[in-house]
Amino acid sequence: MKEKIVLAYSGGLDTSVAVQWLIDKGYDVVACCLDVGEGKDLDIVYKKALDMRAVECHIIDATKEFSDEYVSYAIKGNLMYENAYPLVSALSRPLIAKKLVEIAEKTNSVGIAHGCTGKGNDQVRFEVAIKALNPSLKAFAPVREWAWSREEEIDYAIKHNIPVSINHDSPYSIDQNLWGRANECGILEDPYAAPPEDAFDLTNALEETPDTADEIILTFDKGIPVQIDGKTYELDDLILTLNALAGKHGIGRIDHVENRLVGIKSREIYEAPAAEVILKAHKALETITLTKDVAHFKPIIEKQFAEQLYNGLWFSPLTDSLKLFIDSTQQYVSGDVRIKLFKGNAIVNGRKSPYTLYDEKLATYTKEDAFNQDAAVGFIDIYGLPTQVNAMLHGGYSNEQ
């Protein structure tokens, strides 16, 4: 009896070729395809996997789990790698790995294969996650082993009658889920080349966006968006709704050269319409609901959390601890944020919360001012005391020092 290997199957170029490659190596292939909100026709993927001679194909709808257990932390933690990338692909990898391990254990498979290259981050994310969840499972990386160029891989697919929606004129590598869309390869590898419009799918070009703005009110409950204009949504449905609305206005396009975990720089084109709107609104709500010390310290945790995710360390003691901290900060992050969507911009122009720490009577400069300005003299004396003592000892500060 042949040994079984579970393959993370997307129906795309890499994993379609990988099925044939693993069969040639003498394994039975158990294909596994997860829906994490990318809108793919899974019936076609299922049929394609079996047509490629996989012995089984498991289709798993994990969209809600993805939104509730993973995207929720991206929102509460304002997670952005290098202050630019909302972790679109990185966020889904631990969940995909978790489901692959479950299928491998259920089918008595000896290992798990993925379609990642040897130059990318995903190979690390998948294999480290698999080791964390079940160290006895082997990891297989067909694309890394065969080391073909993109063009050679396309030629192999054509030669073996493997149907793939890719050609030499448009050789993009695309990954999409509920939280956004990532695109690389082809002309995008030149960091000076402007991305052609066919590189985008979720967002309109600015020239094609409406000339009238949409203004929405996004309601949060403990850091999670729950309503748009008073209508309640499950998180996954809310994100899909915002993707369509914000994408119509050209919001969420990101052109970023990032520092990969494996040591190289990579130019990526991301589309994350809902993510841009939600994160801007969430940050705005935090400005009135977090204390100063938490507001100043939380970005340090956010940066570390984003790097943990980007580097494939979701299943780790540190990430568990970071999640606990993030959760503890969100108890009072509830309220409404008003956002204007127009010509590629998501503009926050109002926020309110029943837990607001903003006191208008203290902030105002009108006659209703409740701030005791006389107290400022004593505060300045105490606050400036170390500076005063230093100046008295050393004769005052000068530019020469």
UniProtKB/Swiss-Prot annotation:
Keywords: Amino-acid biosynthesis, Arginine biosynthesis, ATP-binding, Cytoplasm, Ligase, Nucleotide-binding. GO terms for biological process: argininosuccinate metabolic process; L-arginine biosynthetic process; urea cycle. It comes from Staphylococcus aureus (strain MRSA252). InterPro entries: Arginosuc_syn_C (IPR048268), Arginosuc_syn_N (IPR048267), Arginosuc_synth (IPR001518), Arginosuc_synth_CS (IPR018223), Arginosuc_synth_type_1_subfam (IPR023434), AS_cat/multimer_dom_body (IPR024074), Rossmann-like_a/b/a_fold (IPR014729). Its main location: cytoplasm. This is Argininosuccinate synthase. It catalyses: L-citrulline + L-aspartate + ATP = 2-(N(omega)-L-arginino)succinate + AMP + diphosphate + H(+). The lineage of its organism: Bacteria, Bacillati, Bacillota, Bacilli, Bacillales. Belongs to the argininosuccinate synthase family. Type 1 subfamily. SUPFAM superfamilies: Adenine nucleotide alpha hydrolases-like, Argininosuccinate synthetase, C-terminal domain. The keyword Cytoplasm applies.
